[in-house]
UniProtKB/Swiss-Prot annotation:
InterPro entries: CcmE (IPR004329), CcmE-like_sf (IPR036127), NA-bd_OB-fold (IPR012340). This is Cytochrome c-type biogenesis protein CcmE. Belongs to the CcmE/CycJ family. GO terms for molecular function: heme binding; metal ion binding. Signal peptide: none annotated. It comes from Hahella chejuensis (strain KCTC 2396). It is a single-pass type II membrane protein. Residues 1-8 are cytoplasmic. The keyword Membrane applies. One of its GO terms (biological process) is cytochrome complex assembly. Heme binds at H124, Y128. The lineage of its organism: Bacteria, Pseudomonadati, Pseudomonadota, Gammaproteobacteria, Oceanospirillales.
Length: 149
């Protein structure tokens, strides 16, 4: 192999290694900031990781909201009409938050199976539903046995 070809091969090799290292670092940085979405059924089945930042979404169960009169602590239950997840949140809830409405909460699942929310987002209006919540609700309704009233 002549010296010029050898020099080009070394340069190309270093470039490939450098680009690979850069892509690897970018992927590692992005993966630590990704919050995966889970519906209440997946959380109840144990598919959601404990003590890792995730998103949980569904409908707020009617009659489930309880507020602490001494602080901003709120507890409520989220459902996908198949399973329920208890959520605790301390902070100011969005103006559009109410029972029977869709929400997406970001936080961590504790060892007792209670979702400790750090952020709660409510849907924008009566027609809007976050896409991941809508898919989760549709999936849960398809899987649920038919109910007769």
């Amino acid at each position: 192999m002549n010296p010029k070809r050898k020099q080009r091969l070394i340069i190309v090799s270093f470039l490939v290694i450098g680009v690979s290292a850069t892509v690897g670092l970018i992927m590692a940085a992005l993966s630590s900031n990704v919050n995966h979405f889970y519906n209440p059924t997946e959380v109840a089945q144990g598919a959601a990781p404990v003590d890792k930042s995730i998103r949980v979404g569904g409908m707020v169960v009617d009659g489930s909201v309880s507020r602490d009169g001494q602080s901003l602590a709120v507890a409520f239950t989220v459902t996908d009409y198949n399973s329920n997840v208890d959520v605790k949140y301390t902070g100011i809830l969005p103006d559009l938050f109410r029972e029977g409405q869709g929400i997406v909460a970001t936080g961590k699942l504790d060892a007792q199976g209670v979702f400790q929310a750090e952020e709660v987002l409510a849907k924008h209006d009566e027609k809007y539903m976050p896409p991941e919540v809508q898919r989760a609700l549709d999936k849960a309704q398809d899987a649920a046995p038919a109910q007769t009233y």
